[in-house]
Design a protein with these regions (language model features):
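Hydrophobic alpha-helical membrane-insertion signals
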Residues: 1-29
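Generic alpha-helical segment signature
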Residues: 11, 24, 37, 58, ...
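Short amphipathic alpha-helical interface patches used for protein-protein assembly/oligomerization
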Residues: 90-94
């Protein structure tokens, strides 16, 4: 029977509690149970006067509001303040009464500019959330993946000027110069005067600078959009996809440049370096490979395809003999090491007399040259070791897991938490946005882990579910003890062929297996080769 709707019901009085209006399974209830936010008060109390002035708004309340904005992808603080006054669940999470108004959007802006501008509060909050993740066993610390993503700055790409910027020497330049001097000493050549390597006071390169946001960088890369951007270099742990480090640079800085700093930040946050790190092909660099080897980290780096488009033979047609340190041309003639350049490349030259009558001379080098030259970086051996490992079955498994960790983390941040665009001007505000976004994503990992444990403990009382859960956990334990996992069937460890004597020695450690990616069950992987193993021709 159709009933008429009573009018004026909005004007009736009811006795209700805010606690009753928020569903038990609401996301914010889970966040409240999983995360302890009380540390924010201790973190910020020194920024407030203890005995003078008007009573301030609790800093924990302000940052809880910011967390709501990042968690639900609310980019505008005006919109966020409006949502707090209209959304009952938001009021409950902030500890407000039903009729109490939340802080104004200008209050958040004023505190950011006047109180939280120069003390890295956002980074400290991220560190504390990460500490809670580590404390609850969500971070393995063995296998990490690092990558970068571009974030559109609040700057018009047409409003720019050009300035001359002095080139900053790379962190590894001193070590590279020492290796170059050793090379030249072996060849009986005079060492370079490396003081000439320092950029002159008036030197440098022309660089586009935005007149709106001078701290961002113009991005000019193949396959990337043109304009002014920032780059976030993010490192995630493979166990539960927890973000363990965030580093922000202008987009005109090469991805390779901040890697030494990133490794130091990871060591400071975790207390140790990982056993292996995965990178995409943008980090395919001999200096990075040497840095990883020096820190005893097994790298897994995407392989770059040969892109030689010239009319003469590319370097990939020449085979390198590790035992004799020579290159072999397609006609089976040797190219010998003759010198090392100031940039750190060893130059290998062929015999001009043999090249003179070679049937492939015109295909190998130009008519103005008398012999062929091939360059090899002084740290190329370290990069070759990584290339060899990445091509193995276990290396491919490690590399394939990269897109399910770091790529998924970036996709989540951009699609759900507003990281596609910078919210404010300046690299300091960009760092705050990246750190708080990463902190919110780690909070979601904490919530997921906590309520998975609660689910397993509650369903243990149901016989059928209890049996299934017990079988699932037993399978987890078997895999963590080192059982091998293939695409279809588990394989017993004793059935795996061990390395022959004299070959590359290896150790085994479990990594996440893509077959069980939904719950991060580990599978086996071949770790780094023994460092004492001699080089052999690939």
């Amino acid at each position: 029977m159709l009933r008429e709707k009573a009018k004026g019901r909005q004007m009736e009085y009811e006795f209700v509690m805010l606690e009753e209006l928020v569903p038990e399974d609401h996301l914010l209830r889970k966040v409240e149970k999983a995360v302890d936010f009380s540390f924010i008060h201790d973190l910020c109390k020194d920024l407030y006067c203890p005995d003078n002035g008007r009573p301030a708004i609790e800093p924990e309340l302000l940052f809880r509001m910011l967390f709501l904005g990042y968690l639900y992808g609310i980019k505008s603080e005006v919109k966020l303040a409006q949502e707090v006054n209209e959304n009952i669940a938001f009021k409950w999470f902030l500890g407000l009464k039903l009729t109490e108004k939340g802080p104004d959007h200008a209050t958040i802006s004023a505190n950011r500019v006047r109180r939280f501008s120069d003390n890295n509060i956002a980074e400290k909050i991220f560190d504390e959330i990460l500490r809670q993740c580590i404390e609850k066993g969500l971070v393995g610390g063995k296998i990490l993946y690092t990558d970068s993503t571009h974030i559109k700055a609040k700057a018009n790409k047409h409003r720019k000027t050009y300035v001359t910027v002095a080139e900053t020497p790379k962190e590894y330049l001193e070590e590279l110069n020492e290796q170059i001097d050793r090379d030249r000493e072996i060849l009986g050549k005079k060492p370079f005067d490396h003081d000439d390597d320092d950029p002159s006071p008036g030197g440098g390169k022309q660089r586009a600078v935005s007149t709106t946001d001078p701290e961002c960088g113009q991005q000019n890369r193949d396959g990337k959009p043109d304009g002014f951007y920032y780059s976030e270099h993010r490192t995630v742990d493979s166990k539960n996809n927890v973000i363990v480090n965030v580093h922000v640079e202008p987009a005109n800085i090469n991805d390779v440049t901040p890697v030494p700093t990133i490794l130091k930040e990871i060591e400071n946050r975790l207390g140790h370096l990982p056993d292996y790190m995965g990178f995409d092909a943008g980090y395919h660099n001999a200096a990075i490979a040497h840095l990883l080897e020096k820190n005893q980290i097994q790298g897994v780096i995407g392989y770059r395809r040969h892109t030689h488009a010239g009319e003469h033979y590319g370097k990939y047609r020449f085979k390198y003999d590790y035992e004799h340190d020579v290159y072999i041309c397609p006609e089976k003639q040797y190219l010998y090491w003759r010198t090392t350049t100031r940039e750190g490349y060893r130059q290998y030259f062929s015999d001009g007399k043999q090249c003179r009558n070679c049937p492939r001379r015109n295909e190998c080098f130009s008519a103005s040259s008398s012999r062929r030259m091939v360059e090899r970086h002084v740290w190329q051996d370290s990069l070759d070791d990584i290339i060899w490992f990445t091509k193995t079955e276990n290396g491919r498994r490690l590399y394939n897991w990269r897109k399910q960790t770091i790529e998924r983390s970036f996709a989540e941040a951009k699609e759900n938490h507003g990281l596609r665009y910078a919210r404010m001007l300046g690299i300091r505000n960009m760092r705050e946005q990246c750190f708080l976004t990463a902190a919110v994503q780690n909070i979601k990992r904490l919530v997921k882990a906590l309520f998975f444990c609660l689910f397993t403990s509650q369903t243990a009382q149901t016989p059928l579910l209890s049996e299934k859960i017990r079988g699932f956990v037993d399978g987890l334990k078997r895999l963590r003890r080192g059982a091998y996992v293939t695409d279809h069937h588990p394989v017993k460890p004793e059935s795996v062929t061990q390395p022959a004597a004299g070959s590359r020695s290896a150790i085994l450690l479990p990594i996440p297996c893509s077959r069980y990616h939904r719950c991060s069950i580990p599978g086996p992987v071949l770790l780094r080769e023994s460092r004492s193993a001699p080089h052999t021709a690939r």
